[in-house]
Design a protein with these regions (language model features):
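C-terminal beta-strand-loop-alpha-helix "lid" module of Rossmann-like NAD(P)-dependent dehydrogenases
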Residues: 1-223
Length: 224
């Protein structure tokens, strides 16, 4: 987790210095065209995990300014895909097997597909919807914007002294062009690992709750 957090901070810091991201061969967007959002949605293939899957789906359905037709879903896990399909969202790709055994190679392949669509102008923004793992009993649904990367200008200014020590070879924009594919792949893989841990924790909590409720009901019936 610290590695992936540092990756995000580093790319954001570079953007604070360069001020933009220019991806190789990216087609200029027609201002009259809607900005389509490519969203990687990480859920599970099974139920019995409390609100784990529905909470991830709500990260998308709860965006009031997002039109259903402007969202393109890349689903990892069947449960999130099923919820979003019922809500009318377009699922372009589905990878139910990836969440069973998360691997960096799978994250890299998905990253390449997304960046190809981004460069072609088919999608204008890339998001990642997953469950952030805090500990075994605490998990937080999280929507992270991957591209275009947003950074805090004030935070960038506050670290100006540190940034001044950074030298880019080649130039910063060229460096970003090389880093962005690894940046996207790393964040997808990190989210997969966190989601897998969160799913296990959520399922344990759900089963513990079900067991506790069953015992309470057993005691109640026994008293009657």
């Amino acid at each position: 987790q610290p590695y992936f957090n540092k990756m995000y901070e580093t790319v954001s810091g570079m953007l604070a210095k360069s001020g933009t991201v220019r991806y190789p061969g990216k087609r200029e967007k027609n201002p009259d065209e809607p900005c389509k959002k490519g969203v990687i949605v990480i859920s599970s293939n099974r139920g019995l995990a409390g609100g784990y899957n529905s909470n991830v789906a709500k990260l998308i359905t709860g965006q009031e300014d997002w039109k259903t037709e402007d969202v393109v879903v890349y689903a990892i896990g069947n449960k999130g895909r099923e919820i979003l399909e019922r809500k009318g969202y377009t699922v372009k790709e589905s990878y139910p097997e990836v969440i069973e055994e998360p691997a960096y190679a799978e994250a890299m392949l998905l990253s390449q597909k997304l960046l190809t669509s981004f460069a072609a102008g088919e999608i204008g923004e890339i998001y990642l919807a997953y469950t952030h793992f805090k500990n075994t009993v605490s998990h937080e649904p999280k929507l992270l914007k991957l591209l275009p990367v947003e950074y805090d200008a004030e935070a960038g200014a506050s670290t100006e002294g540190a940034d001044a020590l950074m030298n880019f070879e080649p130039e910063d924009v060229e460096a970003l062009d090389m880093i962005i594919p690894k940046y996207i792949s790393s964040l997808i893989y990190g989210a997969l690992m966190e989601a897998a841990a969160s799913e296990n924790g959520a399922r344990m909590q759900a089963m513990d709750s079900a067991t506790s409720n069953a015992r309470s009901e057993e005691r109640r019936v026994g008293k009657e």
